[in-house]
Amino acid sequence: MARALMRFSRRELPGLAAGAVVLALSAMPTFGQAVEASAEQVVQRLVEDIWATLRRDSADERHRVDELMAVLEARTDVALISRLALGRYWSRLPESERQDYQDLFRDVVIRSMARRLNTYAEDAKSPLQQRFRIVSSTAVGEHDVLVRSKVFPSHGQPLDLDWRLREGPSGPVIIDLIIEGASLLVAQRSEFAAVIERGDLEGLLAELRARAEAT
């Protein structure tokens, strides 16, 4: 065996080393595959956290909604979503009002989503694997990943629920939900644009303030 190994000349060693590197790299996941797997983990952990929150007994509905908001904010980029929801009007919003707008967006839009999730407390009594399953994931452009999943409600037909994530400094974060092909971000942008076109940006802020006070 030793004699056989000695037959390799020094000139052959670089080629052998290169071949070993190629084989090693081919066995490793690509960058795209790694990002997609990371995005799936973010979605899975978010859903698990939502499920755990819904399963906890809570006589105070507002407290559980607050908990659900915290769960959502931990896995989403609310600041980015609020900017995307405003679209081209973001650049027209005075810098002095941007933080106010983003705070209102959180209080109105994210709280509304948390309230909607709170209505699924009955479904959460079932094991999560009976109600939710990740199907696949794929890269979208250079920075985003779309994670496709299925939701199996206790009543009604299964739903397609897709999650759009964008790579951030600390990993992928959720920036949109697509329910049965309908983007929540696109719907929110259309709603905001309609309010602005009827009046102006101040009109949108006034409406958001009124809705926040009503919650």
Named regions from a protein language model:
Residues 1-9, 16-27:
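N-terminal secretory signal peptides
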Residues 28-34:
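Sec/Tat signal peptide C-region and signal peptidase I cleavage site
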Residues 36-117:
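Early exported N-terminus immediately downstream of N-terminal targeting peptides
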Residues 103-107, 111-159, 214-215:
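Surface-exposed, charged secondary-structure patches
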Residues 158-186:
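Short beta-strand edge/turn micro-motifs at domain boundaries
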Residues 176-215:
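Low-complexity, intrinsically disordered terminal/linker segments enriched in charged
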